[in-house]
Amino acid sequence: MHGDTRDQSTPVAHTVDPAVAESAGRMDSDTRTDPAMPSPRASGAVRTESSESQASTAQAPAAPPATDQPATAARQPGAEEDLTAAPRRRTTSTRRTTATAATRRAAEPGSAAADAEPPARKRAAGKSTTKTATAKTGTKTATKPSARKTTESDTVIGRIPVLDVSPQIDAGRRPAKAVVGETFLVTATVFREGHDAVNANVVLRDPRGRSGPWTPMRELAEGTDRWGAHITPTAPGRWSYLVEAWSDPIATWRRTAGVKLPAGIDTALVLEEGARLLEQAAAGVPKKEGRAHVLAAVDALRDPGLPPLSRLAAALAPEVLELLARYPLRELLSASRPLPLQVDRERALFGSWYEFFPRSEGAVVDPNGVEPPRSGTLRTAAERLPAIAAMDFDVVYLPPVHPIGRAFRKGPDNTLTAGPHDVGSPWAIGSPEGGHDAVHPDLGTIEDFDHFVAEARALHLEVALDFALQCSPDHPWVNKHPEWFSHRADGTIAYAENPPKKYQDIYPINFDQDMDGIVKETVRILRFWMSHGVRIFRVDNPHTKPVVFWEKVLSDIARTDPDVVFLAEAFTRPAMMHTLAKIGFHQSYTYFTWRNTKNELTEYLTELTGDAAAYMRPNFFANTPDILHAFLQQGGRAAFAIRAVLAATLSPSYGVYAGFELCENEPAHPGSEEYLHSEKYELRPRDWNRTDTLAPLLTVLNRLRRRHPALQQLRDLRFHPTDNDQVLAYSKNATTPEGLTDQVITVVNLDPHHVQEATVTLEGDGPHVVHDELTGAVYTWGRHNYVRLDPSAEPAHLLTVRRNPT
């Protein structure tokens, strides 16, 4: 957040609890607001709800002032206004009061009290005639987020409790995540004593601290006290959100009137109480928005010539209900403390990735082994880009392009002895020709790399570069920075091991001798490649480096280049994977490769699309140069098609490694997940003109993903019952820019060897006309639907449904 640059003009007089006013501090951010739209208004200063005992750090926005009693929160003359429509506050008495300087600070724009003040109902300074009850309280508010200490407001429940706000990452110490235009659900527990009605809304604050739009919440299930609303950030940056709750006197009156008037109980009194409430609310409805409708209802409630139920009906007219929903009358306003939200660009969530080794494109290999192989170059690799773009991929991902060490170089299939012409592993980085900021001479020059990036960009492809923070024994760092490596008892540098695997050609980094130096060098290298057009990095094995190291590196990059995306290749324990996501990685590899049965997929995707979706975004690679799963080895072409459909429709980001479309599935040996003739250790030119390619299927999947917003999001995934464990059915839903409901239903045969039949059960009413994007067939589907899927033909249905919103 930036320094306090708010309007310093004199605020309108108002009343606030003196104890609160004395301790109220200014939020350390630019909280000026847009004059276009007002924000919710309340009958009192907002109380911070902190009974969840959630610690706050410099990353979290400062909490608003807290008070037990209602207070007028006046807007400064000339200050910019909030972005949303403003609910009306209810006043309780009429005596002029004067604000203290501390009180004025508490009501500055950006404080919760100021955010609650509606610009549509401004009063001139010195003209206020309202009085509110006050009571002394020991509540304090820190002046800066970084200096915020635990106070009474951290432990005392507000007048209207607001508890368990979600999403909330590490008690608010880390931001929840979304991308521009992504809609997600905010929930909270809201209730009060007795039977009076409560209501709630979410306030979303943009990176400049402007509040709006506020979004009404609803009780998710009657009697649960759990409220929710969907919000959608519209620009990248660090946002925040909070939940406001209040006592709703008009809703309480409606409920009472609906019982008493038909029974003839207290008829005149009930009608007059309603008239007074609506009269107060009408003052908060702008004339141009329809204030006259509310005033007409007031007149009807007081019209003795009308029957009581007709007078009530006027107050319940649709236009009156709609206006008071937009401009509610709020009492006893309470609020959660603001929670941070990091909003990234779309590619952080959605994209189709294609990985290939540039040295194999244009390579020449003598099948008889007589002539030495000739490596492809970045220029010849660029010739492959049009075919990748034609399949509608979004990202082309390159393994390391740096010089490869010669010491302990690996031979074919990871053999320990390399021949004179063996090319080695690209992950054994560094030679006398250079390190992480150099291009392998066989691939060309940095100018050739720039050409590759430019060609990709012209085809609307982004380039992702592998970043592997490790060295070959020949890397310049070995001599320049020996303290960056671990040394064994005999003085030699320890090579990498992941028992039973040994990587004698790779030296891992030791971060504990000079972490600051390694951070500085890492940031320099990343910025070097960023200056050459790379805005996505796939980070190799980040789980083998300290989390705090990555936090330092990623925060440094995000400070100036928040559009740069980092994918964590972390096949590791859940705690590490989730923590890497929380500290700044935008995406993560997952266990998708090893989830193949109906139960495995359902359970795993339920986990990923649940609470974890607020901070961890999966990228489902169907294969990698390291992993050829037994399902692909044994299932043939149908298995590849099945896994492609699953990856492309379950996750908004997915990828394949070159050769997937050719169904390459020969393992190094039985039981191995390594490829025979692994491209990690040798050149592998391919015949892309083969007719048995899966490229047409990948193209259909990628085009479908681009056309359907439902497939571009993670959180709204629903599994549907089937009566066959070999048939998996699920759907995704989203709203299109045109306001239509976009739904994609996927039904997959998980058995690559046999035809499977099942009945798919869908919730809701039918029938609906659905279109199969794979075959072009059109079906009418209702609640129970028969399917028959032949893996040798089409192993899945990809059904699209479009309806007008209800």
What are these regions (language model features)?
Residues 479, 483, 487, 510-580:
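Active-site neighborhood of glycoside hydrolase catalytic domains
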Residues 1-52, 56, 61-63, 68, ...:
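Carbohydrate-interacting/catalytic domains
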Residues 397-406, 467-476, 540-546, 569-573, ...:
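Short, solvent-exposed turn/loop segments enriched in Gly/Ser/Thr/Pro and often Arg
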Residues 347-376, 404-452, 479-516, 676-684:
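Aromatic- and acidic-residue-enriched carbohydrate-binding clefts of CAZyme catalytic domains
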Residues 376-387, 514-529, 639-644:
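Short, acidic/polar
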Residues 472-483, 550, 558-559, 571-599, ...:
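Substrate-binding cleft/loops of secretory-pathway carbohydrate-active enzymes
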Residues 554-569, 574, 596-670, 736:
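Catalytic-core region of carbohydrate-active enzymes that cleave or remodel glycosidic bonds
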Residues 352-354, 396-398, 463-465, 537, ...:
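Hydrophobic faces of well-ordered beta-strands that scaffold small-molecule active sites
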